[in-house]
Amino acid sequence: MTNKRQILVTSALPYANGAIHLGHMVETIQTDIWVRFQKMQGHDCTYVCADDAHGTAIMLRAEQLGVTAEEQIAKVKADHEADFKDFLIGFDNYHSTHSEENKALSHLIYERVKANGHIAERSITQAFDPEKNLFLADRYIKGTCPKCGAEDQYGDNCENCSATYSPMELKNPRSVISGATPVAKESVHYFFTLPEFTGYLKEWTRAGHLQDEVANKLAEWLDAGLQEWDISRDAPYFGFEIPGAPGKYFYVWLDAPIGYMASFKQLCDRTGKDFDEYWKADSNCELYHFIGKDIVNFHALFWPALLSDAGFRTPTKVCVHGFLTVDGKKMSKSRGTFINARTYLDHLQPEYLRYYYAAKLTGSVDDIDLNLEDFVQRVNSDLVGKVVNIASRTAKFVQKAGGALSANIINEELWQSFVKAGDVIAAHYENRDYSKAMREIMALADLANEFIAEQAPWALAKQEGNEQKVLDVCSLGINCFRAIMTYLKPVLPQTAVAAEEFLGTELTWTGPLSFLGEHTINKFKPLMTRIEGEKIEAMINDSKEATAAMAKTIAEPAADSPLAKEPIADEIEFADFAKVDLRVALIANAEHVEGADKLLRLTLDLGGETRNVFAGIKSAYLPEDLIGKHTIMVANLKPRKMKFGMSEGMVLAAGPGGKELYILEPHEGALPGMRVM
């Protein structure tokens, strides 16, 4: 084995304002598999996480429920920990950002950064709710669009005409929280001078800490110029007060990543581990953050700059993964595919999903799809039909011979293929390319099953004098099963324990596997059962019911059908419709708009002509996911001068808003510039 490594690993902190769902589980399962693999290899690998427990949303949710914020986050944390435990996530410590450790570390880092001259103060004007005495983020303000007159629009952008504006430009603005009319109010805010770290970050992001595609995307942001980072919020706010600034609180994204350090600090205080050994600037230990692609800027720009400025080490690697889709689409509450972890666990074994995710996950940032039909087929075929089948087909013959395995390797070539595969599979685990690891393992399972089928011990056993050959064949089969379960142990820890009980030995993997001969095994018991389609259907139905119950709990109106909510408009003549020139357009480029919460800037290719269009779809799409898609645009809409530039058209999208927005895409074969009639 190589030298023992000291590794600290984290997953992104789930927000303490809702339940864990299967999207969250992509990351924690991915991380847990990697950690379990490292521990099996003999390394000192520590896995910590915490609830992200601060912010206005948590404060308001607690108020809505009639409890204190502390009571709210304590309940959610208990629910989160139960879900993770039942999904076999092996945290070494799980904490909360609302902790004394996090408060002390946040103060320390802030004071160091401030002493280095990297905290700026300046007054900004914000919308203020005079009834709640609360500064309002744009999402907490609604009113009538000042440009097109559409009602019920958010405070920075109109979803009807895509116009952008300041909250105070809205007609009849109101606070979503109290219904009061907001007023403009000045306040001093504190900023981390991130632009001063541009040179450092350009080097850091190209130094092997990130996947290439992530580094390339960050290069675009760095070249466009960074903005100072507002790290403060005004009271009332649930969080940590900034030292020396009464009534000012750290913005949640300041103390949230510090929560990684705080959780590890709590572990160190409990176990005697050396905190500084892992976090000092010249540490030889390794630090890995597993995160989703939606929070890359916080972890790969703000976080390394903050850490380095405060005299701490930066991450060895930020491992970025994609999003989860279900049956090829975004998770949907109405379709029942927005599945909470607990709903899944009420119906299915956790290892089914752990294996399926592993079979899909690569080292890239690509999204993964939970195709429910494929999920059932793959689990039943791979785990039950292939892996478990090896043991179930051979164990009874060993038991009949007395229960002891033969030391004779009847097919040395086959066994060596299992031994040599260990290094290849280990490399795939190390690189987080679990899908390749699973393919290698299933290929071994196929070899083992083919060998058993060819030898047919059930037929040999019927012929007198074949007792030793039957034992030799089945002993090799059992050893093949043992090798496969060893390689699968990071993915299937629960089944691995059951396999260890059957085999009468621990599954270890610190080097090449040895053959288990002259060893007594125990009676075989079924290790895994098939998934029945009825369980999937029941899970989907329960997800729909849970969504309806939650909507009732938080006093949201019942969901009407789109047609009932927005009836069909008055009839128009064909000539009126013909005035609207709809064209197929290729999205040649898409990028974030600095300072806009809801807008993306799209460059549309009409087949010889390009248009610049601002679209209010940021809540539903990442820019990189749009590039290369075809869509439909209104090509003859009069250009509008907006805050961020000229918009030369409009793309068409449907949906109620938020994450449920869907741009229109033509069928394959439609070309840029074609008219839609």
From Swiss-Prot:
<feature type="binding site">
    <location>
        <position position="161"/>
    </location>
    <ligand>
        <name>Zn(2+)</name>
    </ligand>
</feature>
<dbReference type="InterPro" id="IPR029038">
    <property type="entry name" value="MetRS_Zn"/>
</dbReference>
<dbReference type="Pfam" id="PF01588">
    <property type="entry name" value="tRNA_bind"/>
</dbReference>
<keyword id="KW-0862">Zinc</keyword>
<keyword id="KW-0694">RNA-binding</keyword>
<keyword id="KW-0963">Cytoplasm</keyword>
<comment type="function">
    <text>Is required not only for elongation of protein synthesis but also for the initiation of all mRNA translation through initiator tRNA(fMet) aminoacylation.</text>
</comment>
<dbReference type="GO" id="GO:0000049">
    <property type="term" value="F:tRNA binding"/>
</dbReference>
<dbReference type="GO" id="GO:0006431">
    <property type="term" value="P:methionyl-tRNA aminoacylation"/>
</dbReference>
<dbReference type="GO" id="GO:0046872">
    <property type="term" value="F:metal ion binding"/>
</dbReference>
<keyword id="KW-0067">ATP-binding</keyword>
<dbReference type="InterPro" id="IPR014729">
    <property type="entry name" value="Rossmann-like_a/b/a_fold"/>
</dbReference>
<feature type="binding site">
    <location>
        <position position="333"/>
    </location>
    <ligand>
        <name>ATP</name>
    </ligand>
</feature>
<dbReference type="InterPro" id="IPR001412">
    <property type="entry name" value="aa-tRNA-synth_I_CS"/>
</dbReference>
<feature type="short sequence motif" description="'KMSKS' region">
    <location>
        <begin position="330"/>
        <end position="334"/>
    </location>
</feature>
<comment type="subunit">
    <text>Homodimer.</text>
</comment>
<dbReference type="InterPro" id="IPR002547">
    <property type="entry name" value="tRNA-bd_dom"/>
</dbReference>
<dbReference type="InterPro" id="IPR015413">
    <property type="entry name" value="Methionyl/Leucyl_tRNA_Synth"/>
</dbReference>
<keyword id="KW-0820">tRNA-binding</keyword>
<feature type="binding site">
    <location>
        <position position="145"/>
    </location>
    <ligand>
        <name>Zn(2+)</name>
    </ligand>
</feature>
<dbReference type="InterPro" id="IPR023458">
    <property type="entry name" value="Met-tRNA_ligase_1"/>
</dbReference>
<keyword id="KW-0648">Protein biosynthesis</keyword>
<dbReference type="GO" id="GO:0005829">
    <property type="term" value="C:cytosol"/>
</dbReference>
<dbReference type="InterPro" id="IPR033911">
    <property type="entry name" value="MetRS_core"/>
</dbReference>
<comment type="similarity">
    <text>Belongs to the class-I aminoacyl-tRNA synthetase family. MetG type 1 subfamily.</text>
</comment>
<dbReference type="InterPro" id="IPR009080">
    <property type="entry name" value="tRNAsynth_Ia_anticodon-bd"/>
</dbReference>
<keyword id="KW-0479">Metal-binding</keyword>
<keyword id="KW-0436">Ligase</keyword>
<dbReference type="InterPro" id="IPR041872">
    <property type="entry name" value="Anticodon_Met"/>
</dbReference>
<keyword id="KW-0030">Aminoacyl-tRNA synthetase</keyword>
<feature type="short sequence motif" description="'HIGH' region">
    <location>
        <begin position="14"/>
        <end position="24"/>
    </location>
</feature>
<feature type="binding site">
    <location>
        <position position="148"/>
    </location>
    <ligand>
        <name>Zn(2+)</name>
    </ligand>
</feature>
<feature type="domain" description="tRNA-binding">
    <location>
        <begin position="576"/>
        <end position="677"/>
    </location>
</feature>
<feature type="binding site">
    <location>
        <position position="158"/>
    </location>
    <ligand>
        <name>Zn(2+)</name>
    </ligand>
</feature>
<dbReference type="InterPro" id="IPR014758">
    <property type="entry name" value="Met-tRNA_synth"/>
</dbReference>
<dbReference type="Pfam" id="PF09334">
    <property type="entry name" value="tRNA-synt_1g"/>
</dbReference>
<protein>
    <recommendedName>
        <fullName>Methionine--tRNA ligase</fullName>
        <ecNumber>6.1.1.10</ecNumber>
    </recommendedName>
</protein>
<dbReference type="InterPro" id="IPR004495">
    <property type="entry name" value="Met-tRNA-synth_bsu_C"/>
</dbReference>
<dbReference type="InterPro" id="IPR012340">
    <property type="entry name" value="NA-bd_OB-fold"/>
</dbReference>
<dbReference type="GO" id="GO:0005524">
    <property type="term" value="F:ATP binding"/>
</dbReference>
<keyword id="KW-0547">Nucleotide-binding</keyword>
<dbReference type="Pfam" id="PF19303">
    <property type="entry name" value="Anticodon_3"/>
</dbReference>
